[in-house]
């Protein structure tokens, strides 16, 4: 099986079916694949190498058609969102050394100067009559070819390009379609940026089964009024997002099953799904399936899943992350989750040093060090226990920051929580700051102190004395990354005033 053969075959069977719906425009499979074929034809006619191609733009029809067009030429695509800061874009271009940049938006002058070898989407629209049935799909990415490269943050500040092969993506897509019962003509929420690997949860399961992508623009996802209006006017069957994004949507009183009877399942990845969020969601959508999944970008989207229902909520205070997909083995070595098998990416693109640090061979199979702490419970279900990177030493004790956060979430009035270590000039931890967003509204510092006095005894019942936060800060909002996750780095900087 080849993903792009499947997409082309499906488009031949149902060319007039809607492939993607934007806020003001609908596009059929014929339109999408005709546009992708135009891209492929233009690239193939250019005297460029087989190196990866950067696609610079916003979510939607133009960028999706371009991604597919690049794949049809046998090249890897590198999605870079148009809202990406210039300095980061510059680092990605330097690291990737692409053969070409295709931009689907107008460029600012500094980006025009950066992208010296580039073409605009409008430059191949002269072939508008090109029929996708003429494309030779044998040239498409296949097997162990790199399908896409997602650039993630590196500890040194330099982005690392995770090189995901067609076989990686194929394994993921087949698992999604089977285990999540993706049927033909399903309508998927497509909210995640294409430069964020959560996007593949919607894109490829939808396109390989004749589904429709309900595409949200960044203008819609960052404006609550526009977001709620768009959701209420859309038919969605399968919801894909980070937990932080659904928490925003749950603020809308009209976001309930009665108003969204077609919403059959919610799939979450990208960050931890809290007990509280899952419980709220099931209260509002009692007949929908709620899936908690887990997996780093380096393991192609996700590699474990579990359906969260009332029984799971009753049995677990901190939600488990499930069981492994076919073709993947999970080992716990020194408390660390190790992923082995056909979902493990090729490595970091042209970065052998960083690749060697976390990718390795395990009994003849590809394996990856996640740096996530975890364990299997008595039901052989995998549980996430926080980032090993977030373990600190405080007064001689090793403390997992996310362990404290998990217990803060158990307190009814706490909606969001994050624990920040406070360090002195010698980088020694001198205190723990709990940053909290509460359902209560505190008008005065006295009210905050009264709440602290109330919750400390509750925390004392679940955490050791040395884990007790030394300071509590209350915020109305938590900053989010463009990918919809809580921005831990920005929040830490905000709390510590730029100093640690």
Predicted features along the sequence, with ranges:
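Core catalytic subdomain of AMP-forming adenylate-forming
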Residues: 28, 41, 85, 97, ...
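Conserved AMP-binding
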Residues: 57-60, 81, 182, 192-196, ...
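Conserved AMP-binding/adenylation subdomain of ANL enzymes
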Residues: 160-189, 197-237
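AMP-binding/adenylate-forming domain of the ANL superfamily
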Residues: 1-149, 275-278, 326-329, 480-494
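ATP-dependent adenylate-forming carboxylate-activation enzymes
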Residues: 38, 57-61, 75-93, 105-107, ...
């Amino acid at each position: 099986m080849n993903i792009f053969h499947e997409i082309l075959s499906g488009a031949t069977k149902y060319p007039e079916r809607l492939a993607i719906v934007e806020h003001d425009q609908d596009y059929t499979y014929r339109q999408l694949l005709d546009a992708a074929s135009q891209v492929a034809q233009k690239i193939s006619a250019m005297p460029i190498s087989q190196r990866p191609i950067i696609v610079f733009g916003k979510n939607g029809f133009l960028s999706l058609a371009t991604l597919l067009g690049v794949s049809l030429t046998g090249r890897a695509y590198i999605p870079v969102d148009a809202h990406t800061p210039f300095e980061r874009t510059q680092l990605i271009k330097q690291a990737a050394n692409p053969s070409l940049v295709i931009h689907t938006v107008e460029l600012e002058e500094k980006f025009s100067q950066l992208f010296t070898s580039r073409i605009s989407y409008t430059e191949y629209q002269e072939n508008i009559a090109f029929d996708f049935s003429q494309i030779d799909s044998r040239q498409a990415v296949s097997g162990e070819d790199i399908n896409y490269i997602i650039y993630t943050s590196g500890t040194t500040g330099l982005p690392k390009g995770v090189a995901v092969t067609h076989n990686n993506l194929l394994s993921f897509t087949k698992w999604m379609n089977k285990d999540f019962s993706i049927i033909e003509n399903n309508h998927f929420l497509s909210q995640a940026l294409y430069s964020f690997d959560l996007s593949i949860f919607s894109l490829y399961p939808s396109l390989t089964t004749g589904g429709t992508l309900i595409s949200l623009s960044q203008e819609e996802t960052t404006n609550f009024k526009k977001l709620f209006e768009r959701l209420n006017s859309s038919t969605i069957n399968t919801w894909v997002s980070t937990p932080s994004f659904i928490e925003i949507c749950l603020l809308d009183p009209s976001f309930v099953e009665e108003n969204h009877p077609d919403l059959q399942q919610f799939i979450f990845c990208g960050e931890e799904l809290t007990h509280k969020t899952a419980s709220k969601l099931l209260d509002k959508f009692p007949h929908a399936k709620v899936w908690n999944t887990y997996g780093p970008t380096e393991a192609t989207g996700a590699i474990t899943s579990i359906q969260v229902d009332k029984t799971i909520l009753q049995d677990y205070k901190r939600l488990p992350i499930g069981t492994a997909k076919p073709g993947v083995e999970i080992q716990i070595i020194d408390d660390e989750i190790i992923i082995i098998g056909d979902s493990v990416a090729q490595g970091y693109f042209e970065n052998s040093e960083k690749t060697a640090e976390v990718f390795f061979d395990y009994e003849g199979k590809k394996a990856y060090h996640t740096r996530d702490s975890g364990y299997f419970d008595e039901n052989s279900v995998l549980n996430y226990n926080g980032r090993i990177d977030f373990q600190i030493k405080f007064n001689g004790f090793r403390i997992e920051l996310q362990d404290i956060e998990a217990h803060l979430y158990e307190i009814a009035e706490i909606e969001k929580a994050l624990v920040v270590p406070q360090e002195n000039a010698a980088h020694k931890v001198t205190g723990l700051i709990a940053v909290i967003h509460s359902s209560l509204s505190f008008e005065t510092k006295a009210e905050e102190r009264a709440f602290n006095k109330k919750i400390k005894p509750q925390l004392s019942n679940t955490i050791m004395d040395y884990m007790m936060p030394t300071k509590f800060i209350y915020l109305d909002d938590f900053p989010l990354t463009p990918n919809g996750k809580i921005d831990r780095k920005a929040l830490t900087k905000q709390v510590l005033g730029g100093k640690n």
